[in-house]
Design a protein with these regions (language model features):
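Short, histidine-centered active-site or binding-site loop motifs used for metal coordination
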Residues: 2-5, 100-101, 233
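C-terminal nucleotide
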Residues: 69-228, 240-278
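Catalytic DNA-binding helix-loop module of base-excision-repair DNA glycosylases/AP lyases
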Residues: 22, 236-237
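Short Gly/Ser/Thr- and Asp/Glu-enriched loop/turn motifs at secondary-structure junctions
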Residues: 230-236
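Gly/Ser-rich oxyanion-binding loop with an adjacent helix/lid
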Residues: 1-89, 221, 247-251, 270
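Buried hydrophobic positions in well-ordered alpha/beta secondary-structure cores of metabolic enzymes
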Residues: 13-14, 42, 58, 97, ...
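FabD-like malonyl-/acyl-CoA
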Residues: 15, 237-241
């Protein structure tokens, strides 16, 4: 097996897991195992055998392919919708920048996010925050702050706003409104930095490669694009949506800081794992 997925980027393990699932489905099941089930098997493997408390989003992205919109209300049967979009039709490209800081030792930081959000949900007698209304949450913030850390509260605030942003972003793409989509990406990234706080580890605040990449990217891009942290955060990569006529400039400038080959200009593949008959 060969791979061009960046090691420690936050997607490498998911890509590996679903590739193995696709291979086994092809060898023994005539490719009949659904992409979502392969993603769920990959998540189980990562949770149980590798001790990484990941969700299902990365595995679904790798297994289903295309840009996808996922509703996790029923964890056993998530609703996955492909969003048909070609960034080139909007004269933009997706750039992924490797900041050369690995996710490998950040399991505790990543795990704290769902743990703290669930702590807020448990205050209301629920398992997940989606079962709590934003209005009810805001009405009890003083009591929440007495019972738990402020970070739990601020991360919960991000959750409610982020869910709304997802719907707005999907709607914008379906309506060919790329300016609104970029605006949502920008506000989502800002919220990740300020409220979700997944840009650098509180256990190692002297190393802030993602922060540097975002700051430099905003300076380089100006009004030519938007950027945000990519994946689970804390390290790994950032993403930037850049106007096509400015992509090479952005790539040249950002690679001055992170090295030649650190900026990858990508296209979103429309398919997940496939068997190719030779």
């Amino acid at each position: 097996m060969t791979s061009e997925v960046l090691q420690g980027s936050g997607l490498s393990s998911s890509a590996f897991e679903v590739m193995i699932g696709a291979v086994l489905s092809g060898l023994y099941n005539d490719m009949t195992v659904s992409p979502v089930l392969i993603a769920q098997i990959g998540q189980y493997t990562e949770n149980i055998y590798f001790g990484k408390p990941c969700g299902l989003m990365d595995q679904c992205a790798s297994s289903v392919g295309a840009l996808i919109h996922i509703d996790f209300k029923d964890n056993d049967h998530p609703v996955v919708e492909k969003v048909d979009v070609d960034f080139s039709s909007f004269h933009h490209s997706l750039c992924i920048v490797d900041v050369h800081a690995s996710h490998a030792d950040l399991t505790d930081d990543y795990a704290a996010i769902p743990t703290e959000m669930k702590e807020v949900a448990h205050f209301f007698g629920k398992e997940f925050l989606r079962e709590v209304s934003e209005e009810e949450f805001k009405a009890h913030i003083p009591e929440l702050r007495e019972k738990m850390s402020d970070r739990c509260v601020i991360r919960a605030l991000h959750f409610f706003k982020e869910d709304a942003r997802v719907e707005k972003a999907v709607s914008a793409l379906k309506n060919n409104d790329f300016d609104t989509f970029k605006s949502v990406i920008k506000s989502s990234g800002d919220s990740s930095y300020k409220y979700l706080q997944n840009i650098y580890s509180n256990h190692d605040e002297t190393n802030q490669a993602v922060s540097i990449a975002l700051g430099l990217s905003e300076d380089i891009l100006g009004d030519k694009g938007v950027c945000r942290v990519h994946g689970g955060g804390f390290a790994g990569t950032i993403q930037a949506f850049v106007e096509d006529d400015y992509v090479e400039t952005y790539k040249t400038e950002i690679e001055k800081y992170f090295g030649k080959g650190s900026c990858h200009i990508l296209k979103v593949r429309k398919y997940g794992g496939k068997k190719v008959e030779l």
